Amino acid sequence: KQEKAEQEKAEQEKAEQEKAEQEKAEQERLAKLQAEQEKAEQERLARLQADKELPPVEDEQVQQAKAKVKEKETAKSSTAISKPIDVENSYKSMQLMAENSYKLIDMQQGQLRYLASATCSVGTEKACLSGFTHYQNIDKANAIQTGISGAYRFDINQTPLVVGLAIDSDSYSSLPTGYEYQGYPLPLIGFSVDLIPSLNPTSNGNALHLSLKGAYVNRKVTIKRPILDNTEAGKGHAKISGYYIDFQGYYPYTLNNLITVTPFAGLTFNQTSRSAYSETQGTKLAVHYQELNAHSLLAKIGLGIEYTVNAKLKLDSKAGLLWHLSHHQGDFQSHIDYLGQQKINYNDNKKQLAQRPFASVGLTYQLDKQSSVNTTTNWQMTPYRNQDIHMGIGYTYRF
């Protein structure tokens, strides 16, 4: 019995040992299989990752095509930028700008001069009011101005002193090429102070008369550069400002009941400027412009004639000469980005006139004792040989 028990125990231990070895072998096999599967999966994922990072051959061709297109666009862009950089045409464009700028200054000075003389005449009454309109032409640039004026008479030691005020606004304008008013232009303002002994009924009229007149302008303009080949149409904004002062003495002399001759002499000062500005639109290479200004002191001498056609109609004319006592016309200066400075002395193109003639003719029709209608045409040569012509009509009521 004891041997049989020991034999069964030995067989049981052997069976348990074989079972343990089988389980261990199975675990090792499963672990090895799992390791191989994990390794294979890692390799597969690595290949997928590599495939994502490396573009296919077709994508490389597309990228090469895109690169060529980009190079063409870059070359085209470079060409587009280089086109405006035409130094010769840019300089010609600046010359045109200079000529038109000086013409605008002449135009504004002409309007100031006209307004300073537009104050109504009180005649033998105490005060007057008038409305007027006039057309201006200066070398293809033109404008229509409409205004009102008023004057009042004071008697100082039996000598009539007449003080007047006038306002002139723009109704229509075609300014020199490249210029236009920005919005509605502010009106011009004028004044006059006249010492008129002949208005005293006790005087025979043959006495020295004195006159002080003036006008002021301040307006905003938009300026567009002339377009030439391989240049740009740059645009900017600036201000035009200036004033006009005229002082003269005149001596009316009555030849007979029909004709009065009036010699006159005086001094005139005017100043007009266009502010500095830079182009802000329509350009890649902006131009920067320095202030352009002009001022003159002139001596004036001339003769006026008034002819009484009948009780209602009078004809008057005037002619004279202006001498430049001093005159300054600033050089036209501009600076183009990457091209540098341009400086234009306008004297090189048009030599200014040291003596300038002027003339006018007018007609006054007396509607009744208190009201009249007058027309006037005047002409003057500007400093740079532009002909400034004004034609106007007005109505005056005295009271």
Regions inferred by a protein language model and the residue ranges of each:
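Solvent-exposed, glycine/polar-rich loop segments of beta-barrel outer-membrane systems
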Residues: 173-178, 220-237, 273-295, 326-353
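Intrinsic-disorder-driven secretion/translocation and chaperone-binding regions of pathogen effectors
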Residues: 49-64, 204-206, 256, 289, ...
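Long, low-complexity, compositionally biased polyampholytic IDRs enriched for Lys/Glu and Gln/Arg
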Residues: 2-67
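Outer-envelope exported proteins of Gram-negative bacteria
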Residues: 149, 164, 207-215, 260-268, ...
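Outer membrane beta-barrel transmembrane domains
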Residues: 187-194, 289-399
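Membrane-proximal, glycine/serine-rich, low-complexity loop/turn segments characteristic
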Residues: 66, 71-79
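Outer membrane beta-barrel translocator domains of Type V secretion systems
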Residues: 77-253, 378, 383, 390
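Secondary-structure transition into beta-strands, especially the periplasmic turns and strand N-termini
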Residues: 199-208, 253-261, 307-317, 371
